[in-house]
């Protein structure tokens, strides 16, 4: 990946639009700003996914179909979106630069983040202790801040460092 990319934040959002994990990689009091960016990105993602025709089974296997491109820019941040086939939304905020950001580089970041999430959820030893009430809300996934999700957060932090994040906030 080119060194000019700098990842400022990553957000994982459930299909019901509940934040699973919002991780910031900038120093300072900008954490609330990235929560705002994640929530406003949901409106753009919902609008784009509602306007697109439903995918056929043959087309839905492509990871590029999950990539939602540049959602918007705000101040010094470019926001990109990705929606998994199970409707989990991954949002990244990259620092704006004068350099060209290639879609292939952004898609590589999303594939890595999606793989980390998929591996964490598929861990058979991760007991989420969610009540079985028939409701299809992934409420147990909202506990990503709990110690059970330490490996998930660590892997997301590793991706942030590999992309070029400055520092990791707790």
Region locations from a protein language model:
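Acidic, low-complexity cytosolic segments
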Residues: 1-8, 20-170
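Short, acidic, Ser/Thr-enriched surface-loop or helix-capping motifs
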Residues: 14
